Amino acid sequence: MNDLPQKFARTQELNHKVSELFQQRVKGAQGRLQARLKDAFAQNAGALAKSPTQLAGLGMNWGDYMTDVGQRSVLFWETLYKRGNQFLAHQRAGLPPVLHFDYETVLDARTFARPVNYALLRIIPPKGVKIDPKRRPYVVIDPRAGHGPGIGGFKDDSQVGVALRDGHPVYFVIFFQHPEPGQTLLDVCETESVFVKKVRELHPDSPKPVIVGNCQGGWAAMMLAASDPDDTGPIVINGAPMSYWGGAWEEGDNDNPMRYSGGLLGGTWLSSMVSDLSNGVFDGAWLVQNFEGLNPANTYWNKYYHLFANVDTEPARFLEFERWWGGFYLMNKEEIEWITQNLFVGNKLWSGGIKAKSGRFLDLREIRSPIVLFASMGDNITPPEQAFNWVADVYGSTEEIKARGQVIVGLLHQDVGHLGIFVSGEVARKEHSQIVSVLKSVEALPPGLYGMKIMTIESKDGEPSYEVEFVERRLEEVIPQLNKYKRKDEKPFEAVAAVSEFNQRAYEMFAQPLVQAMSNEMTAKLARDFHPLRAQRWAVSDLNPWLGWLAPLADMVRTQRKPLTAGHPLRKLEAMGSEFINASLDYYRDVSNAMSEASFFELYGNMFALTMADKEAKLLAEPAVEPRQLPVVQEALAKLANGGFAEAATRIGFLLQRNGEPMPLSR
């Protein structure tokens, strides 16, 4: 009873802070909306008002404008028609990877004793590019998060392209649309370990391969390196979430809303139910729909208006990207449950709570190769806190990083979005290219934590060149800079984990038998085919007999095309209207995100304050013991001077031994 006033005070303080922050978010959203509407008016209608000639000509230009709009409309719908046919053709072909480069299959894990739907490809260098087989090979792991593989080699200016141009052999880990029956994420981890061993066999005279992991492929690469540290070289993880509860509660115009979605939906039970409705298979289109929901302005207006406004030049680029974006892949129920329960909600990757197929727990401190972390302040799917906070959780201090002989390099982009980290040609030419060029320098760095700075130097011919500088940083300074609220905003996620576990058990006991009884392969296929993201594609394709007139009409329009320039007065008014819609949708998104954030902390923040905060305080009451101060460690340090070479070699061998396993002779 004596704790009730203290608990009540905590909840009052929390509710006040949440209310203040919500008001701040909404006020900021309103200010941005007003500013954008004002700018759009000034740049378009305002400019017309200052030009009497253009203003007077508006009435005479309507005919030309309507002709242009009609022609653009036909070409716009023809592009969507082509997208639908491209979607169907891609499906019939089995959704091959969207790689820009030719390739050959080295290993197909569907033929393994424990089959999984993964394969290892060797990228064939394009004409004029020479590869040195003795140079360090690269292994790129693409994300399996709803879309298909290939985004790491989507264009010439890509991670694959910059490594090839630097003379490195490049291998690519892909996956197929349908998972093998019963495969798990731990099976995938073992398979990727086999792939890396195969690459080492193919390049016996080369240094250990670089492992490049994009987004989900990043934490997969870290699991791979922790399970098999003797075969992996430097690890580069791009936009990869590692600390899943992290975010910037008090910083920025709007927070990272994706981290709240699991809690607001009640935890992991929903992914289980969706899988059960699909006969034990999870449809990746639901993940893609979540991504699209993060930016409704782009999803519902911007990308289509950009195509409409530039329909004479834009279709090729639009269709190229849509081929990847519209390729939806599947997971086993066991896989998505493992991801949601152990990572997104459980947050167990950094804590050593994940057990490999071998039976031992994965410890990220076992990784001995340098680690390069690339994140962006503009990424609202993997914010920098999720990319970097695990370092503090795993190592605790700068001294421990050094004591364990680890090199960790952080590279932070200021504004590129999540997809831009992998797709942007500018990012590939600058950040990814420089990462490739300096990996030898990274390996030569003494143990510690470093920031990587890339400085642009303009040359006389106009082509930029780059210089890289490594600045040693202290973990104790970096983490507070990223987490202004001292990570207190992560505490409510402990309540989310508890509620999620309860809801998961309740679903499995009371609802799952009924859901599974209603599901079969036919209902699962119907649900996938009529998913909104698929239906909007095949509905505008050859499958629709009412659209047979569209292609001939588009051909006729092209022969009689009368385009207006973007500076035409009515085109300017059109652009203003588009910006009004765009700004309004962004305002809706910002307010929606603010409401999600406030609801999350009102619910789970209060739950943590009332039921879990006191228990945690008791657990933290005993201060942590510095490992070097333990009596057994002090005794060992005192005896270091005893003995000769044999004793020293024995001690080194004992220290290099991992989890009681014999030390390989190569080490």
Placement of each model-derived feature along the sequence:
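Active-site catalytic motif of lipid deacylating hydrolases and related acyltransferases
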Residues: 134, 143-207, 520, 558-559, ...
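A catalytic-pocket lid/entrance helix-loop region that shapes and gates access to the active site
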Residues: 228-295, 400-402, 406-412, 419-439, ...
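Short beta-strand/loop motif that positions the catalytic acidic residue
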Residues: 367, 373-375, 379
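Gly/Ala-rich beta-loop-alpha elbow adjacent to hydrolase catalytic centers
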Residues: 212-221
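Short, surface-exposed "cap/lid" segments of acyl-processing enzymes
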Residues: 91-179
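Acidic, metal/ion-handling microdomains and their immediate structural contexts
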Residues: 616, 621-667
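Alpha/beta-hydrolase-fold enzymes
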Residues: 1-78, 201, 205, 222-337, ...
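Conserved alpha/beta-hydrolase "acid-adjacent" motif
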Residues: 381-386
